[in-house]
Amino acid sequence: MGRFIFISFGLLVVFLSLSGTEADCLPDWFHYEGHCYRVFDEPKTWADAEKFCSEQANGGHLVSVHSRKEAGLVGVLAYQTLESPIVWMGLSKVWNQCDWGWTNGAKLKYEARAEESYCIHITSKKKEWKSLPCRNYGHFVCKSPA
């Protein structure tokens, strides 16, 4: 367990040193590859979290993940900040269709979900994607363009 925390912390330090805090991100937001990220420790339903993210930054949404590297970053940020296993992402069923879609309109290119349901959260420790009813409360990560 101690080694896992040490490695996770090391990854976070590497991400921080490579990305830094850009002037284009709001205070307390983390910059990475042209986007700003922030973990919020305020449990909300998925819809309330998405609304909150859109109010925090121009173009803000619940986090969308498009690569294994970005998934690792989000998992490390969430794990270092939160004790909760539930961290909402911006992936959900779109208007009762069979298609999954990101709240920012981006196409789904990368996924690691464990099962289907309504809204997806990332487990902060294992960094796996799982589904829960959207009415459940969870912490969340917002993402916006830098």
Curated annotation (Swiss-Prot):
Disulfide bonds join 25-36, 53-142, 119-134. GO terms for cellular component: extracellular region. GO terms for molecular function: toxin activity. Expressed by the venom gland. It holds the Pfam family Lectin_C. Coiled coil: none annotated. Residues 1-23 form the signal peptide. It comes from the Eukaryota. Its main location: secreted. Residues 32-143 form the C-type lectin domain. The keyword Iron does not apply. Keywords: Disulfide bond, Hemostasis impairing toxin, Secreted, Signal, Toxin. The keyword Signal applies. It is found in: Secreted. Interferes with one step of hemostasis (modulation of platelet aggregation, or coagulation cascade, for example). Belongs to the snaclec family. Shows greater sequence similarity to the beta than alpha subunits compared to other heterodimer snaclecs. Heterodimer; disulfide-linked. This is Snaclec 1.
